[in-house]
């Protein structure tokens, strides 16, 4: 099944599969997915919004027919399919503790119908009991584990007893919240020991070290902390299951804030380093990975990747490592003599083989030098590449390595960004901004006494998209949530951190329902 791809936010949409921005699923989509190297798809389906009343909880025949059609299309294209129960987990299954008998009866009825419908399908169809299970109104994890074990056991028995191909079909069981903390893994391991079924796999989800994955608390880079979080997570999963011969499916992986409609939250090169490392380490730990894609990676209308270079990095990671660098950005000042610029190469077991600018191979010694892991771009080369030094990207280089995909390096001319005065209400404040070639990394917010300001009160570095945004080339926007969290009448100093290393300070004050901002 490795590697896998999620048909995300499609058969959870209301009222139909196109309601959340994706087109109707076609055979061509699965042909594209298969041609790109994927061997399996995960098919998230929400059933409860297409069910009748108790006690039968009959699934709408038209809905069942639609799901059957999509399963068959994927199977026809020689893909493995993992079919699940998806948003039902928080729409009604989460009430198992407070409405036990009703929820369990509905769960039984739902899986009884699904199992009967697909009992004779190819063994390449696998079934997953529930997505991201959680329970409301419980006394804590001990009760949560007991409830999940009950659900998984009911699911297992219904499917196995339904006969046909279901007697030995691969079944996939999640941890609580599909989380990989040790207690979650241990609880599921106990369940598996009780089931004594060799055709059961486990699943967890992984979206990276949370502060990096959403850009909060200053974690703008895929650094040692983020890397250690990934390796520790995959090690725990490996030791709990794959080392004991139990398959593991990382049923969803991506970055929480990655979206083609919201560029800049996670810097592009840092994204690439994350996906490169994740793919390699999952392979080393023998984990099956399924990319969560609700349309942010593959444009399902054009059937083209929204960022072909990013997907090339993901695809390469399934089989080999790639070289990267400390950054994919080299910033040059708008005026004045240019000096040589250094980057640190992350060879990842590869050999550095040179630099290219378009079809031209740069000359070692004249255009760049390499000393150990230090790559130095000479002042003369940068001067030629920068040309008239217009703001923004002046040239794009490719660092080539002995294997994997090239590393892109943008040569960027910049000057200190300029933020202008602004006024408005607490619903949001648009701060006119001349970025002048630079790119925003994060925003720090403090009151005059040094204490943190903003909804994330535990850190001065606020969360992109929750406290601020910068999706256009002419403004930084402070959100209503950020402004509403500010103390009335207390000045806040914002420090905007840019990828060039430049910092720009700005003052903002809320007075009742009004907000004013001015350069510091």
Regions found by a protein language model. Give the residues of each.
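Active-site region of glycoside hydrolase catalytic domains
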Residues: 105-219, 236-256, 285
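Acidic/histidine-rich helix-loop elements
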Residues: 7-25, 54-59, 98-99, 211-227
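Catalytic domains of carbohydrate-active enzymes, especially glycoside hydrolases
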Residues: 24-46, 237-241, 281, 288
């Amino acid at each position: 099944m490795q590697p896998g791809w999620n048909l995300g936010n499609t058969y959870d949409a209301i009222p139909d599969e196109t309601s959340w921005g994706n087109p109707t699923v076609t055979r061509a989509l699965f042909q594209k997915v298969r041609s790109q190297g994927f061997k399996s798809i995960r098919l998230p389906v929400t059933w409860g919004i297409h069910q009748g009343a108790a006690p039968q909880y009959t699934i709408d025949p038209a809905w069942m027919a639609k799901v059957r059609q999509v399963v068959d299309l994927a199977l026809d294209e020689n893909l493995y399919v993992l079919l699940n129960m998806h948003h039902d987990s928080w729409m009604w299954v989460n009430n198992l503790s407070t409405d036990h008998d009703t929820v369990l009866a509905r769960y039984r009825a739902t899986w009884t119908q699904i199992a009967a419908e697909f009992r004779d399908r190819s063994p390449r169809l696998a079934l997953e009991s529930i997505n991201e299970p959680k329970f409301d109104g419980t006394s804590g994890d001990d009760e949560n584990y007991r409830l999940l074990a009950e659900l998984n056991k009911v699911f297992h028995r219904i499917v196995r007893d339904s006969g046909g191909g279901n007697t030995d079909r691969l079944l996939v069981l999640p941890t609580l919240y599909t989380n990989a903390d040790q207690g979650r893994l241990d609880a599921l391991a106990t369940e598996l020991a009780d089931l004594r079924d060799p055709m059961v796999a486990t699943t967890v989800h992984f979206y990276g070290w949370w502060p990096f994955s959403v850009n909060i608390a200053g974690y703008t880079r895929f650094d040692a902390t983020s890397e250690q979080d990934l390796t520790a997570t995959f090690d725990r999963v490996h030791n709990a299951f794959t080392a004991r011969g139990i398959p593991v499916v990382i049923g969803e992986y991506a970055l929480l804030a990655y979206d083609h409609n919201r560029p800049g939250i996670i810097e592009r090169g840092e994204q690439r380093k994350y996906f490169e490392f994740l793919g390699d380490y999952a392979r080393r730990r023998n984990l099956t990975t399924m990319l969560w894609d609700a349309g942010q990676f593959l444009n399902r209308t054009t059937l083209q990747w929204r960022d072909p270079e990013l997907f090339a990095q993901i695809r390469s990671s399934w089989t080999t490592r790639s070289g990267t660098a400390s950054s994919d950005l080299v910033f040059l000042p708008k005026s004045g003599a240019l000096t040589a610029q250094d980057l640190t190469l992350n060879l990842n077991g590869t050999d550095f083989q040179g630099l290219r600018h378009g079809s031209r191979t740069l000359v070692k010694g004249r255009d760049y030098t390499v000393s150990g892991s230090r790559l130095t771009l000479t002042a003369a080369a940068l001067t030629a590449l920068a040309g008239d030094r217009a703001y923004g990207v002046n040239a794009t280089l490719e660092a080539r390595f002995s294997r994997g995909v090239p590393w892109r390096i943008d040569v960027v001319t910049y000057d200190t960004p300029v933020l202008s005065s602004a006024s408005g209400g607490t619903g949001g404040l648009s701060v006119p901004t001349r970025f002048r070639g630079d790119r925003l990394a994060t925003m720090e917010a403090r009151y005059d006494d040094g204490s943190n300001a903003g909804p994330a009160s535990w850190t001065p570095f606020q969360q992109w998209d929750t406290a601020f945004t910068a999706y256009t080339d002419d403004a930084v926007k402070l959100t209503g949530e950020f402004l509403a969290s500010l103390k009335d009448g207390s000045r806040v100093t914002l420090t905007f951190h840019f990828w060039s290393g430049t910092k720009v300070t700005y003052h903002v004050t809320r007075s009742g329902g009004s907000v004013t901002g001015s350069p510091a």
